[in-house]
């Protein structure tokens, strides 16, 4: 009886964990050494949270073999957006810049939750000069070749 209870509890906790993780917003993190250079793990069907800073531009860089095909935004007016190959240059230019953005490349689809705020200074650790996507499957493929 105790075994059955533990199995049920384990199954419930596993389900709860999967539900929470699948609805989590993914945030960029610093690579180490330079806080303004950030990476973000690509997770299919995740929403990536981006915080832009007024008066500063950021590059979002996708895989080298990706090319941007379409960018759409809920409210594009507050943002300056310049696509270039596998990169997007982003800069908030108006107040109330909260919106969403979808990027479709030749390989993947990305969903972004967009926000903007003022930076404390050019050395603000929340400021991102570049955000590079990292793809776990590509990392595994490279390791298996070595």
Report the location of each language-model feature.
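Bacterial N-terminal signal peptides that target proteins for export
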Residues: 1-10
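A general "mature secreted/periplasmic domain" signal
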Residues: 22-146
């Amino acid at each position: 009886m105790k075994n059955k209870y533990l199995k049920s509890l384990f199954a419930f906790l596993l389900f709860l964990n999967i539900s929470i993780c699948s609805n989590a917003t993914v945030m960029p993190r610093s690579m180490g050494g330079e806080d303004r250079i950030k990476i973000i793990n690509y997770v299919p069907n995740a929403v990536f949270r981006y915080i832009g800073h007024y008066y500063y531009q950021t590059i979002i860089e996708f895989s080298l073999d990706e090319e941007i095909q379409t960018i759409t935004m809920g409210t594009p007016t507050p943002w300056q957006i310049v696509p270039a190959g596998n990169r997007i240059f982003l800069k908030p230019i108006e107040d109330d810049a909260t919106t969403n953005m979808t990027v479709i490349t030749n390989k993947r689809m990305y969903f972004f939750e967009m926000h903007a705020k003022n930076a404390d200074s050019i050395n603000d650790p929340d400021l991102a000069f570049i955000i590079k996507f990292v793809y776990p499957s590509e990392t595994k493929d490279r390791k298996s070749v070595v």
